[in-house]
Structure formats: C-alpha cells, structure tokens
Amino acid sequence: MLHPKLGRVMNVVYYHSVVFALMSTTLRIRSCRKCLRLEKVSRTYTIYSFFVGIFLFLNLYFMVPRIMEDGYMKYNIVLQWNFFVMLFLRAIAVVSCYGTLWLKRHKIIQLYKYSLIYWKRFGHITRAIVDKKELLDLQESLARIMIRKIILLYSAFLCSTVLQYQLLSVINPQIFLAFCARLTHFLHFLCVKMGFFGVLVLLNHQFLVIHLAINALHGRKARKKWKALRSVAAMHLKTLRLARRIFDMFDIANATVFINMFMTAINILYHAVQYSNSSIKSNGWGILFGNGLIVFNFWGTMALMEMLDSVVTSCNNTGQQLRQLSDLPKVGPKMQRELDVFTMQLRQNRLVYKICGIVELDKPACLSYIGSILSNVIILMQFDLRRQRQPINDRQYLIHLMKNKTKV
C-alpha cells in the first residue's frame, strides 16, 4: 500500500537518478498495477552510465576559464584557492560516485533485488497489522517532506545560477562553456542529494511503520498477538540490516557528499562576506538571490541532517514503543517470550551512521558541523583583514622612509 502522492514524488527522485546515471540498472514501474520490479540488466544503460561519468569528469577542465585573469577572483587569493579546492572535491565526488556504481555494480543490483523482495514480503504484514488510515497519513507526511526537499534543492540551484551569471565579467564562448559546465555539476550534485534523501525517506517510512504496527497490537486478540509481534520483530531486524547495508555500500560516495556540502557552505558564506564589504560589486537582485542562496542551502542541509537523525532515532527508539506492550495487564507465555526476544534483539542491534566509520552523525554532530563552517569562514576573513592592512603599512613605510631622506 503506497499513497499516490508519495509514489509520484519517489518517481521524480527515481527519474532524476536515471538521467544522471546514478542507478546500476533501471526499474520497471507500472503505476496502474502498482508494480515495481527490476528491468533486465541493460548494456545500453551501463554504457550510458560510463559516458555520463566521463562527461562530468572531463567537464572539470572547462570549469577553469580565464576568470582568474579578468574575473572577480583576480585580486583575491582566498577566492582562487576556494575555487580550486571546490574543483578538486568535485573531481573526488564524481570519481567516488561513479566508481562505486561501476565497481559495486553487481552488489548494488543484488541490493535492489533484496529490497524489492523485502518490500513485497513485509508489505503484506503491514497491511494486515497497521491501520490503513494511519499508514496513508504517514506516507502523505513523508511525501510533503520529500516535496519540500526538492523545492529547497531547486531554489538553491536557481539562486546559485543567477549569482554565477551575474559574476561573469564578460560573455564569450569560453566563459559561457565554463558556466554551463558548472551548472551541469550543480545539477549532478542536486540529484545525488535528492537520491540520498529519498533513500532516507524510505528507511524512515519502514521504521515508523514498525512503530505503528506495535501500537496496533494493543487492540489484537491474545492468541494472535504473539505471531504478529514475531513478524514485526523480523521486519525490524531486516530493515536494520537493509539500512546498514545501504550505508556501508555507499559510504565513500556519501562521505564526499558531506565534504562537498561543507565546502559549499563555506564558499557561499565567504562570498557573502565579499558582497557585504563591497569587494564584489552587486545590485539589489544579487543581494536578494545571495540571501536566498544562504537560506535555501542551510535549510536544505538541516533538512538532510534532520532526516538522517530521524532514521537513526526511529530505529533505536523502537524499544520505547515495545514497553507499552510489556505494561499490559494480561500477557501470555508465548507473548512474553516474543517480547523478551524482541527486547534482546533491540539491545544488541542499534543503528549508527558514521562517515567512513569514523565520524558519527547525530544532532550534536550537526551543531558541530554548523559551528565548524562558521569558524572556517572567520579564519578566511582574517586573510582579508591582513590583505587590507598590508597596503596601508607599505604606504606608511614609504612615507617614513622619505622623511628620513629629507632629514639627511
């Protein structure tokens, strides 16, 4: 059972991934029959994926125009270094993304098959236990969250496009080609973040469905309740393993996403500083779209962090929902045994998301993430202060030298 709104918005995410070759193979989606299955693995799509990856990597060459000679970065070494660091990180992101898809292609296809089998198996259990209205309400709320994320991504892309166009000093074929290459990479990064967010939405959906199933067991008869609880426990364990498998398989690719998001936020805020001190000339439209870019970028980042934390929290907080069943006055021996098994399973299996197995991402880490962005921007501002003081000190030194010569 899938709400039509959630189905349509997930189709949007899927087709974005297909266009930028972020899938190892295509899916066959029949909306009329609500059927979802793997297509026959196509060599054509594999070749298409290869050419898209090569195209994006070669595009990096055209992203270095003569902007260093006659653009707004000409007299700012910090902006130039930021540009080259972003270029290097984009190269790493492209290599890690498509390298993961090519090197782990067969494993990813097996993951697709496993996910579809999982969805069909526990879909019947969900329909049998969970109230239909509660399930549809949950799916509709997740669809709204996904739609909001898509709007944020495209709003940030629009603001960035307008600002990038305004920053062009002259319009010639070489600079326009570099501009188009940057837009292509912006769209690719947009699709990667959209796909990652879509996977998190689906995982969050499954863990929240488990919560609904546990709550629904209160009204069931005692003789059937223990069997339903066993099915819910199996569903939770399979969902947990599926989440771990997804996180491990795309660990490096997701790590490059977070690193690029980090550097993008620093770059945006540092450009905002340059706008505020008039180092970069702008008009009212530039200020408007610049402020919009800051708002949409940070809003989108916080939305991604919040969804990731929601997946981890909804998985690890299942025990709190299970305590409600333990507090029931009449619990049979079979029911008590299933409760004990499920409780032990929850204690031994907790979901944690770590970047490359090192940095754990949770709410405190998100606050540290934002704080480190601001601290790095402040450090970059110190270079501006030194550059502004340097000409003054040189002029004072020359004046002092001329006075000494006149005295002699």
Curated annotation (Swiss-Prot):
Main location group: membrane
Compartments (UniProt record): Cell membrane
CC annotations in GO: axon; dendrite; membrane; neuronal cell body; plasma membrane
Single GO term (MF): taste receptor activity
Tissue: Expressed in the adult labellar chemosensory neurons, labral sense organ and thorax. In larvae, is in neurons of the terminal external chemosensory organ as well as in the dorsal pharyngeal sense organ.
Residues on Cytoplasmic side: 1-44, 104-150, 215-245, 306-364
Membrane topology: Multi-pass membrane protein
UniProt KW keywords: Cell membrane, Glycoprotein, Membrane, Receptor, Transducer, Transmembrane, Transmembrane helix
Domain of life: Eukaryota
GO biological-process terms attached to the record: detection of chemical stimulus involved in sensory perception of taste; monoatomic ion transmembrane transport; signal transduction
InterPro entries in the record: 7TM_chemorcpt
Extracellular compartment residues: 66-82, 172-193, 267-284, 386-408
Family of this protein: Belongs to the insect chemoreceptor superfamily. Gustatory receptor (GR) family. Gr22e subfamily.
Function in brief: Probable gustatory receptor which mediates acceptance or avoidance behavior, depending on its substrates.
This protein's name: Putative gustatory receptor 58b
Organism for this UniProt entry: Drosophila melanogaster (Fruit fly)
